[in-house]
């Protein structure tokens, strides 16, 4: 949280009438996720093993800034309107997040969270793009999902699917990654985004998979 206020006090400093009104705002971005099946499969069961947020499809490149500094002098001035931003993330020290690691078998066509509905990840605001020859020095983000399918003949198949997320995660906004998994040709991720208000607002959603013409980038 952060707040900034400028006020001129005309009464003695010891007076109880001296009050400064602060309006607090969220300094971070909030990320959440849900997962569901593309459809019910009578001849197969699904088990979620792991969800990772990383800077590359194989998880070897880090994505998120570990630290940064907040400079309140760069916050938009209500009078002049001048601003240059809030966060300084000049450090190249980054990290990935294992959002879920374990066993989750309660998968259905209804979106759910293996942990709990309000289990969120709070990150330093950061813009993720796709690297190109012209712009090689950008931050990339991938969501990687590992799950196991058990068929009716007891044969198993473990899949790892990934999708690049190209999004500017802004401070004070909430985002929801809605993941859909299924048989090897059926995957979906949706990201929903919330407005930047003090109570986080509605989530900005990212949908990935077959239902939204936005399929997973790859499967292993």
PLM feature segments, named:
Residues 23-39:
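A short, Gly/Thr-enriched small/hydrophobic beta-strand-prone motif that recurs across taxa
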Residues 31-33, 49-56, 75, 190-195, ...:
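Generic beta-strand hydrophobic packing signal
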Residues 1-23, 38:
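Short N-terminal edge-element motif at the start of the domain
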Residues 8-9, 42-173, 210-220:
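Tryptophan-paired
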Residues 169, 173-220:
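Intrinsically disordered, low-complexity repeat and linker tracts
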Residues 41-45, 180-183:
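Short amphipathic alpha-helical segments with coiled-coil-like heptad repeat character
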Residues 19, 30-32, 174-176:
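Intrinsic-disorder/low-complexity, polar/charged segments enriched in Ser/Thr/Lys/Arg/Asp/Glu/Gln
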Residues 2-3, 35, 53, 147, ...:
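Hydrophobic side chains in beta-strands
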């Amino acid at each position: 949280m952060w707040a900034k206020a400028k006020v001129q006090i005309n009464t003695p400093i010891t007076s109880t009438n001296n009050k400064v009104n602060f309006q607090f705002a969220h300094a971070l971005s909030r990320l959440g996720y849900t997962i569901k099946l593309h459809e019910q499969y009578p001849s197969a069961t699904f088990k979620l093993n792991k969800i990772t947020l990383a800077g590359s499809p194989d998880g070897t490149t880090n994505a998120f800034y570990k630290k940064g500094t907040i400079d309140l002098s760069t916050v938009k001035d209500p009078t002049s309107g001048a601003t240059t931003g809030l966060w300084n993330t000049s450090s190249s020290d980054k990290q990935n997040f294992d959002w879920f690691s374990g066993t989750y078998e309660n998968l259905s066509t209804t979106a759910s969270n293996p942990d709990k509905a309000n289990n969120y990840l709070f990150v330093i605001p950061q813009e993720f793009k796709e690297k190109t020859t012209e712009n090689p020095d950008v931050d990339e983000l991938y969501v990687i999902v590992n799950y196991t399918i058990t068929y009716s003949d007891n044969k198993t198949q473990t899949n790892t699917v990934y999708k690049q997320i190209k999004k500017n995660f802004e401070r004070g906004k909430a985002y929801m990654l809605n993941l859909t998994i299924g048989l090897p040709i059926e995957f979906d991720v949706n990201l929903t985004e919330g407005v930047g208000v003090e109570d986080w607002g509605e989530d900005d959603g990212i949908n990935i998979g077959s239902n939204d013409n936005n399929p997973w980038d790859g499967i292993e």
